[in-house]
From Swiss-Prot:
Pathway: One-carbon metabolism; tetrahydrofolate interconversion. This is Bifunctional protein FolD. GO terms for molecular function: methenyltetrahydrofolate cyclohydrolase activity; methylenetetrahydrofolate dehydrogenase (NADP+) activity. Belongs to the tetrahydrofolate dehydrogenase/cyclohydrolase family. NCBIfam families: PRK10792.1. Its EC number is 1.5.1.5, 3.5.4.9. GO terms for cellular component: cytosol. It catalyses: (6R)-5,10-methylene-5,6,7,8-tetrahydrofolate + NADP(+) = (6R)-5,10-methenyltetrahydrofolate + NADPH; (6R)-5,10-methenyltetrahydrofolate + H2O = (6R)-10-formyltetrahydrofolate + H(+). The lineage of its organism: Bacteria, Pseudomonadati, Pseudomonadota, Gammaproteobacteria, Enterobacterales. InterPro entries: Aminoacid_DH-like_N_sf, NAD(P)-bd_dom_sf, THF_DH/CycHdrlase, THF_DH/CycHdrlase_cat_dom, THF_DH/CycHdrlase_CS, THF_DH/CycHdrlase_NAD-bd_dom.
Length: 283
């Protein structure tokens, strides 16, 4: 069996194109353009790439982006004061803080200061709480993008045994909540999980987000499983790989996402979609 490759890059392009048409329509109606404020702290190379990719897409489709770059020495209070200022600016629709932040800054304290209706990443406790209560408003971008991909390929999630590897607040935890909403039976594993292999071997849907290059061998994959690889890792050779051994897993899975070109583009597409959702709600 050779898995069908889920092309997130192409699907993300289609989503962005539809949003572009909406932006042009709103412009003809005399509406102001949507806007996104992005805050980056420090010189993390990966963060710079993510920010640059977001800026390029915003510029391409006519969505205004504002980038606030700070050194790693910025104080937490200065960062919070900027967020409070952006909260009050009616010309700013969405606000995001690029993660990770320096360890000296309390991440939750900062994210909580973004008002929920401008929380484009969906990380505010209010928005996560809505997701827990089955009444989502703004959904975190990566889990939202994964569900969108699965639905695009008409994969029936109802009743599937889903295993999420990684329990981060960004992907693993909200992903498990999204899967519950879709009717999956969900197991979430983490660094304290004993015998991880046992769980993965029983997964009909496997979602991996741990940031460890090719950590999951193909031999662990259940034949016919759907494999979603969120990881993005650079090997010493310079090659970009995911958290799953792609070359082996593709021979056992029924569907699989590549790295790069799988989940990454969809995450950005969902960020743009969330921004437009906030724009329409708040206009």
């Amino acid at each position: 069996m050779i898995a069908k490759v889920i092309n997130g890059k192409n699907i993300a392009k289609k989503i962005i194109s539809k949003i572009n048409l909406k932006i042009k329509k709103y412009s003809k109606l005399g509406m102001r353009p949507a806007s996104l404020a992005m805050i980056n702290v420090g010189n993390n190379p990966a963060s710079k790439i993510y920010i640059s990719n977001k800026e390029k897409i915003c510029k391409k489709i006519g969505l205004i982006s504002y980038l606030y770059n700070f050194s790693k020495n910025i104080s937490e209070i200065d960062l919070i004061n900027l967020i409070i200022k952006l909260n009050k600016n009616n010309l700013i629709d969405g606000i995001l803080v690029q993660l990770p932040l320096p360890k000296e800054i309390n991440k939750l304290n900062v994210l909580e200061k973004i008002i929920p209706k401008k929380d484009v990443d969906g990380f505010h406790p209010y928005n996560i709480g809505r997701l827990c209560q089955r009444k989502p408003t703004i959904v975190p971008c990566t889990p939202k993008g994964i569900i969108r991909l699965l639905k695009y390929y008409k994969i029936n999630l109802l009743g599937l045994n889903a295993v999420v590897v990684g329990a981060s607040n960004i992907v693993g935890r909200p992903m498990s909540l999204e899967l519950l909403l879709e009717g999956c039976t969900v197991t979430i594993t983490h660094r304290f999980t004993i015998n991880l292999k046992k769980y993965i071997e029983n997964a009909e849907l496997l979602i991996v987000a741990i940031g460890k290059a090719e950590f999951i061998p193909g031999s662990w994959i259940k034949p016919g499983a759907i494999v979603i690889d969120v990881g993005i890792n650079r090997l010493k050779s310079g090659k970009i790989v995911g958290d799953v051994n792609y070359e082996d897993a593709i021979e056992k899975a029924s569907y699989i996402t590549p790295v790069p070109g799988g989940i990454g583009p969809m995450t950005i597409a969902m960020l743009i979609e969330n921004t437009m959702q906030i724009y329409i709600n708040n206009y």
